Regions:
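Bacterial N-terminal signal peptides
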Residues: 12-22
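Sec/Tat signal peptide C-region and signal peptidase I cleavage site
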Residues: 24-29
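Acidic, serine/threonine-rich low-complexity disordered tracts
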Residues: 30-38, 42-90, 95-112, 162-248
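Contiguous hydrophobic, core-forming segments of folded domains
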Residues: 78-156
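Bacterial N-terminal signal peptides that target proteins for export
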Residues: 2-14
Length: 248
């Protein structure tokens, strides 16, 4: 498959995976209890204009995220895409379904024991492709990468350690190796930042990196900068900066 086409969907599916942005544990959640948190993300394009907004609804059980539903709306407030994730089978390889209603683009996963069923189509005129891949060690997909960063934040924020993960991209039918390293944030000691990029030097030539910042204490995602999981109106990759609003 030609590299430019591959990186188009790699960027859209992979570099948009952190748009879950939940807290490690809401301040009001208690052990052995089911709680819900609703919050919003605002995505701005490279000109600083609002590209879309995200409405998140996260369900927790015993302090761990169980399910998340994200609804994307354009600047007119019209719903344009939906992402649903279920973390009960695997925290880093959730069963998820994504649909961009503008173009009919779909992709998703379903964890079945030691295997992951994946599917996807690039637009409403394309056939749905289905595959089955083995669930590998250090594999993540979709919003599971955010869960991985949150759970390993202490280790990743120390020194110059570089951690590798295998990111599964349903639209590509395979996984790719990504590397994670800490970013220096001396002016903001209360935050921790990470850079995430492809491990392959060839892929790094055409696939952009992403940067994220977390609150050290709450482990909430504060900002995201990189390629969006929503394509632009011309079905091309768009770079965005997203800031998150949480309930007080």
């Amino acid at each position: 498959m030609p590299l430019p086409k591959m990186t188009k969907y790699l960027n859209a599916a992979t570099f948009g995976m952190l748009l879950l942005a939940d807290a490690a544990l809401p301040a009001w959640a208690t052990t052995n209890n089911r709680q819900e948190e609703v919050f919003q993300g605002v995505a701005r394009d490279e000109r600083g204009e609002i590209a879309y907004t995200e409405e998140h609804r996260m369900i927790y059980q015993d302090g761990r995220p169980q399910r998340n539903e994200t609804r994307y709306r354009d600047v007119q407030g019209q719903e344009i895409a939906v992402l649903k994730s279920n973390f009960t089978t695997h925290p880093y390889v959730p069963s998820y379904s994504f649909e961009d209603r503008r173009f009919g683009r779909q992709d998703g996963t379903f964890v079945d024991g030691a295997w992951v069923k994946i599917y996807g189509r690039t637009d409403q005129n394309a056939p749905v492709q289905q595959e089955r891949v083995r669930l590998e060690e250090n594999m993540v997909t979709g919003q599971g990468l955010h869960m991985y960063l949150r759970d390993h934040m202490d280790q990743l924020s120390k020194g110059d350690e570089i951690r590798q993960v295998r990111f599964l991209v349903p639209l590509e039918g395979r996984d790719f190796v990504f590397r994670i390293r800490r970013l220096d944030t001396p002016s903001e000691p209360q935050t921790v930042g990470f850079n995430i990029e492809a491990d392959s030097w060839l892929l790094r030539l055409v696939a952009p990196k992403l940067e994220v910042r977390y609150d050290r204490e709450t482990r909430r995602l504060l900002s995201y900068r990189g390629a969006s999981n929503l394509l632009n109106a011309d079905q091309g990759v768009q770079n965005v900066t997203i800031t998150y609003r949480y309930p007080s």
